């Protein structure tokens, strides 16, 4: 047997192995620009993405994160229709003008109106005829004292003195109309009276309340969704596109594989304008292969996550900081962003990931404990926790993530080889507070490095440290009596 003398490629470093060197600075933390590219064509206002995990990201968390300036990736452990519906919930949750509002025909019953309002969490529905011309509007106030729910909506709706706005009305003009007429919903019609949209007072207020929100060209919150490489995933992509998804991520444990490359090519061939993220990878060769296949961003991380056991079970992986650097270096000049997925334990880890070349970070455990995550709330020994599991756990694979680990050939749970575990994380409160602290840490790091933008932070230098250096970096020789909101060991 002839052993390759270059078998040991390099010494891999991760976040706890380094610190960033401080540099001359002319910017204060509040002055830095935290916007970044998620993909070639999508820009985020903060470099944070929530992981496509079934205890992390569904519509509720995706809405909250997009309002903060990031983006959520909806997990795929659900039916195609259910995932598309989650996309619609996000896209309808906030809009400059709702492009395709929920409507009813004139002969619909009050029971239909009641059920649709309850299902979609809305307080009013435009009523149209067969030609899509606006005939009236019915609100929850119209239903409040109705006993006979078999009455047609046309008998109860507001149809006279209906306040509408012409196509092309700005949000500022719409706000004046809404306030002047003391109404909450403003149908928008074209010159033929056809309904083309709906502007609500609630949406205008959200624009004021969340000025940093990540939105598409129509003023809707952005959202992404995971797809796999199984046979039905082109159908899944089609359903997601029809629902208005902004970006899909071809989500597997080993992105440098034929199935992933073929899926990226297939999706880009069908939907050339759809932004596609591909992963997960950990080498320069993988980054180049996915970029050549047409990926608009690559996701880096094999085994760094707190609930991942891939490195232990399979013996495979690359320390995360080194992996991010290698992939970013390989794609330099190609305009394809790198996403650092996993291993973020402290706010400083995010700063280090970006300095190593990432344009954004993806996190699961960071968000698993927040109010908006879909994980089960658990009370244990008087403390509040939320459930959190890896998509490589047996429980998650049994629910649909088998193809992420290329084990979709079996339906026998006992034949699955897990690469993740199930656990719980402390409850953290609402997501906005967690994101505020993380972005605060990022701003501080940028200030120390003299970086006014994410692009400038990527030029920062590292110093390698010892285990003693890391111990020195943490609070030491003291008993903490009052915990800080942004620090834990």
Where are these regions (language model features)?
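Alpha/beta catalytic cores of nucleotide-metabolism and tRNA/nucleoside-modifying enzymes
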Residues: 1-24, 104-105, 166, 173, ...
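Glycine-rich phosphate-binding active-site loops on the catalytic face of alpha/beta enzymes
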Residues: 67-82, 245-257, 296-314, 344-378
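Active-site-adjacent beta->alpha loops and helix N-cap segments on the catalytic face
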Residues: 30, 79-88, 146-150, 194-214, ...
């Amino acid at each position: 047997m002839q052993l390759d003398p270059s078998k040991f490629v390099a010494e891999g470093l991760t976040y706890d192995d380094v610190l960033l060197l401080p540099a001359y600075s002319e910017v204060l933390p509040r002055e830095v620009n935290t916007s970044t590219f998620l993909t070639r064509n999508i820009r985020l206002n903060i470099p944070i993405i929530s992981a496509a995990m079934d205890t992390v990201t569904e519509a509720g968390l995706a809405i909250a994160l997009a309002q903060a300036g990031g983006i959520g990736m909806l997990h795929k452990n659900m039916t195609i229709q259910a995932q598309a519906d989650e996309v619609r919930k996000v896209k309808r949750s906030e809009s400059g003008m709702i492009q395709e509002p929920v409507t009813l025909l004139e002969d619909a019953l009050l029971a239909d109106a009641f059920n649709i309002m309850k299902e979609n969490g809305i307080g009013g529905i435009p009523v149209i005829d067969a030609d899509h011309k606006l005939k009236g509007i019915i609100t929850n106030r119209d239903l409040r004292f109705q006993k006979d729910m078999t009455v047609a909506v046309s008998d109860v709706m507001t149809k006279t003195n209906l306040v509408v706005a012409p196509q092309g009305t700005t949000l500022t003009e719409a706000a004046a109309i809404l306030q002047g007429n003391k109404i909450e919903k403003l149908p928008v019609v074209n010159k033929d009276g056809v309904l083309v949209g709906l502007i609500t007072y609630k949406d205008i207020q959200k624009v004021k309340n969340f000025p940093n929100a990540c939105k598409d060209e129509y003023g809707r919150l952005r959202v992404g969704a995971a797809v796999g490489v199984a046979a039905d995933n082109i159908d899944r992509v089609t359903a997601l596109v029809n629902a208005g998804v902004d970006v899909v991520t071809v989500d597997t444990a080993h992105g440098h594989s034929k199935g992933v490359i073929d899926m990226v090519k297939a999706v880009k061939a069908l939907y050339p304008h759809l932004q596609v993220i591909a992963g997960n990878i950990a080498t320069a060769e993988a980054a180049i292969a996915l970029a050549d296949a047409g990926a608009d961003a690559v996701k880096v991380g094999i085994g760094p996550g707190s609930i991942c056991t891939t490195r232990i079970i399979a013996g495979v992986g690359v320390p995360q900081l080194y992996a991010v650097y290698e992939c970013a270096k390989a794609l330099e000049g190609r305009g394809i962003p790198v996403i650092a997925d996993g291993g973020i334990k402290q706010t400083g880890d995010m700063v280090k990931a970006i300095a190593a070349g990432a344009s954004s970070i993806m996190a699961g455990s960071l968000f698993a404990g927040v109010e908006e995550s879909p994980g089960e709330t658990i009370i244990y020994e008087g403390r509040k926790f939320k459930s959190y599991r890896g998509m490589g756990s047996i429980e998650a694979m049994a629910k649909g993530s088998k193809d992420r680990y290329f084990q979709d050939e079996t339906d026998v749970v006992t034949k699955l080889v897990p690469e993740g575990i199930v656990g719980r994380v402390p409850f953290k409160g609402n997501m906005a507070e967690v994101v505020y602290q993380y972005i605060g840490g990022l701003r501080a790091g940028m200030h120390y490095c003299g970086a006014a933008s994410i692009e400038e932070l990527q030029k920062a230098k590292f110093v390698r440290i010892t285990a003693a250096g890391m111990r020195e970096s943490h609070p030491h020789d003291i008993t903490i009596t009052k915990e800080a909101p942004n620090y834990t060991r």
